[in-house]
Each structure stands twice: as structure tokens, then as C-alpha cells.
Regions:
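FIC/Doc superfamily catalytic core
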Residues: 1-128
Length: 128
């Protein structure tokens, strides 16, 4: 799977804040670093998140829930979902309202990781 570095994620976050307003900065640098590697963790030499889609959803979800940035955590979570899907040749159909509603539900804990994964699986057109 093609992934993003910590520096790339921070740059994307800064770009989002530039375009949409809000506060710059990282609230918890150690947490952010951990989140970047979270989708690739193993237990007893077995991947916790086996598919590209599971890894992408895990990073996106944790960016929203763990709130590593001062502002824009839902926005960067959604953007990472879209960017990583694109660079890994995954396409899915959605409306902007559906995506916005999804990330609001994630942030409010109305939805969890499995809800996000199932939402994407229901809309994905090609899965690795």
C-alpha cells in the first residue's frame, strides 16, 4: 500500500487550514506520529488491518477521533481518506453531503471504525 509520511500529512493539514480557515498546529505530536503507523501494526506477526481499505479507514478514523491537530481533524480525516484512496487506485461513489455527514457522525461517536469501513465498502467500485 502507498502511504503518506508524517510530514506529508502535516502539509496536507496546513493546506486545508489555508483554504478553509481555522487554527494551525499540532495538539499532540507523539499521538500524531503513532497514528501514522497505527494502520500497519502487527500482533504476533499478523497484520491488524489486512487490506488497503482497512488501513486507509483506520488512519482516517483515528485522525478524527484522537484529535492530534488543534483544528481541522474531521477535515484532515476526510481528506486523507480521499487522498489515500486515490493514490492506491481505490474509487468510490459519494456525495459531498454524505461524506460530510459521515465525518460528523464519526466525530460525535455516532459512528465507529466499523461503520466507516462498511460505509466505504458499500460505495467502493474496486477493492484490492
Amino acid at each position: 500500500m502507498k502511504s503518506l509520511t508524517l510530514e506529508q500529512i502535516i502539509k496536507l493539514h496546513d493546506d486545508i487550514i489555508n483554504k478553509t480557515s481555522g487554527s494551525y498546529g499540532i495538539r499532540d505530536n507523539k499521538m500524531l506520529k503513532a497514528l501514522v503507523y497505527c494502520p500497519f501494526q502487527t500482533v504476533f506477526n499478523k497484520e491488524c488491518y489486512k487490506t488497503d481499505l482497512e488501513k486507509i479507514c483506520k488512519l482516517s478514523f483515528e485522525l478524527v477521533k484522537q484529535h492530534p491537530f488543534i483544528d481541522g481533524n474531521k477535515r484532515i480525516g476526510a481528506h486523507i481518506l480521499l487522498v489515500l484512496s486515490k493514490v492506491n487506485n481505490l474509487t468510490f461513489q459519494y456525495s459531498q453531503k454524505e461524506l460530510s455527514d459521515l465525518f460528523l457522525k464519526l466525530a460525535s461517536s455516532e459512528y465507529n471504525y466499523n461503520n466507516l469501513l462498511n460505509w466505504i465498502r458499500g460505495r467502493v467500485m474496486n477493492v484490492k
